[in-house]
């Protein structure tokens, strides 16, 4: 049985105390970009979510260089996803013996990097020209207007 060479590595950050929506705002900007471009984007973005994501990108690149021996120039973020984690629930004491709940949301972030020098399909896919779909004619003919019944009101 032939064993395929592994071309992807990942880094997983769990229970990061941040809203999943706020982390997705940053993750959507870096998905599909190269490693160097990702580092530059994350260092210049003004969001609090950038630092944990930057640490995960560094970790995924370190995993790629250690496990596969790949160079950082060949790495591309192939998949990046954010899932909601557990919610830490606490009670804050308030006046007159009442208490208000405090919900602290967490998230799980997964960064998957692909080495494009090891992946043969990536070179073939980028060299192929994207085909354009032909637009079908949407103009209605005389015969279609009366047969479909969509032209006239039925009052």
Curated annotation (Swiss-Prot):
Gene: rpl22
Coiled coil location: none
Domain of life: Eukaryota
Annotated compartments: Plastid, Chloroplast
Keywords of the record: Chloroplast, Plastid, Ribonucleoprotein, Ribosomal protein, RNA-binding, rRNA-binding
InterPro entries, per database record: Ribosomal_uL22, Ribosomal_uL22_bac/chlpt-type, Ribosomal_uL22_bac/org-type, Ribosomal_uL22_CS, Ribosomal_uL22_sf
Family to which this protein belongs: Belongs to the universal ribosomal protein uL22 family.
Gene3D superfamilies, A to Z: Ribosomal protein L22/L17
Stated name of the protein: Large ribosomal subunit protein uL22c
Summary of subunit composition and partner proteins: Part of the 50S ribosomal subunit.
GO biological process: translation
Disulfides per UniProt: none
Function: This protein binds specifically to 23S rRNA.
Listed GO MF terms: rRNA binding; structural constituent of ribosome
């Amino acid at each position: 049985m032939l064993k395929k060479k592994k071309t992807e590595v990942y880094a997983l950050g769990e229970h990061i105390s941040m809203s999943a929506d706020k982390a997705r705002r940053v993750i959507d900007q870096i998905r599909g970009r190269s490693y160097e471009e990702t580092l530059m984007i994350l260092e210049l973005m003004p969001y609090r979510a950038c630092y944990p994501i930057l640490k995960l990108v560094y970790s995924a690149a370190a995993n790629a260089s250690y496990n596969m021996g790949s160079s950082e120039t060949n790495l591309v973020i192939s998949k990046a996803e954010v899932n909601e984690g557990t919610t830490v629930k606490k009670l804050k004491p308030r006046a007159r013996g009442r208490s208000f709940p405090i919900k602290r949301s967490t998230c799980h972030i997964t960064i998957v990097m692909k080495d494009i020098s090891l992946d043969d399909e990536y070179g073939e896919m980028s060299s192929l020209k994207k085909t354009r779909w032909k637009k079908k004619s949407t103009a209605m003919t005389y015969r279609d207007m009366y047969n479909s019944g969509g032209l006239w009101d039925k009052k």
